[in-house]
Amino acid sequence: TDYRYKYNSDLFLILPGTEIAAVLFDEKDGYLKMHHLNGILGTKAMQEQAKSGLFQHMERIEPIVAYGDWDGRKVTEAMAENLRDHGCFITYNHPVWSRVEPHEFEIGGIYNSLEIYNYNTVNESGTGFNTTYWDEMLRKGMHVNADAADDNHNGNFPDNFGGYVMVAAESLTHDNILNALMEGRYYSVGGVDGPRIDQIIIDGRNVTVSCSPVERVNIIAGGYVGAGTTIMAPKGEKITEASMRLNGTETYIRVECVDEYGRTAWSN
């Protein structure tokens, strides 16, 4: 869909996008697995380089359908290539809910972001948390950012305003927002009015996190067993800063700020 020209203003910006699907059925038409990928209209440069042109408003992209068995990895690669050839920023969505195997989607370099929190499927069936897969990819050396989303359906349970990203962009323009997303200059939030990450500073081997009042800060690291740390507030209190000294063997770090209700903000 593309509603930019209907709703865009100086204070509100629509990012045109589409979700494409592939479905593996059993012989009784029961859903075995799915791939869902989002394509968000990229920067002007990405649009100009789109090999297949751009998707149009209300254009339907037919789902890929298979029965019994499939090469799930090749399907993911083909779907990502289709979105990339149409000038899109690409996210891979809700792998736990989709019941896919890691080898079917843990592929470096073909999509920009892995959805680690899906508010709809958290409320539907408790299958919306996906950080384990993200860490698997990061531990394997695949550089991929993460995102949180509502996946809003307005169905039988609340699924709006519970998953979103906070972007550090120069201004509210399409290219500035997309450049920030491409470069990972944002953090993701799970939960209505969840925590805020104000700043992450790496000074030499010291990591310092500043955030809104939370119950704990997890500094998660790649490397040896036991890498990273958790800083918890004293019982009944909250913290707004946490720090850790790196030992130099970490392969990556990321931050989680968690409040007393379990609402979480994730850095890239």
What are these regions (language model features)?
Residues T1-F89, N93, V100-P102, I107-G109, ...:
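A metal-dependent hydrolase metal-coordination microenvironment
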Residues E27-G42, R99-N268:
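Charged catalytic cores and adjacent phosphate/nucleic-acid-binding surfaces used
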